[in-house]
Amino acid sequence: MNDKSTVKPPMWFWIVCVIALLWNLIGVSAYLSEAFMTEDVFATLPEAQQSLYETRPKWVTAAFAIAVWSGLMGSLALLLKKKWAKAIFVLSLFGILLQQLYHCFLSNTFEVMGTTAMILSILIIIFGAALVLFANFASNRNWLS
């Protein structure tokens, strides 16, 4: 068998791929805005939010980085119709789950950030899992090579 997929994916496959790419670009943007936050911007945050950032363990930041960068790579792999997109999305989901474990059970993130942060955390987990399932579905349909 050659490196080409045997079945042409439907138009909605490409729409999902673009949505996945945009979603993950938002995640990368959020990560970069945190990673490169200036002291002046940090000083404008409420004290409780500053404390969240200052006390967050390095492994949580690493999980965040893994989640967003592998999510972006998985989205690009889908657009290139590569089977390894699924493995990259699994890595992204692992990063998501580690990060959300901390936010949900090991910190007071939701007390400080409110209900919106809780809803966003749930959506991130759902979207991460959906991308793993979608990549698996696309692979099973021979849309990926």
What are these model-predicted stretches?
Residues 1-145:
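Topology signature of small-to-medium multi-pass alpha-helical membrane proteins
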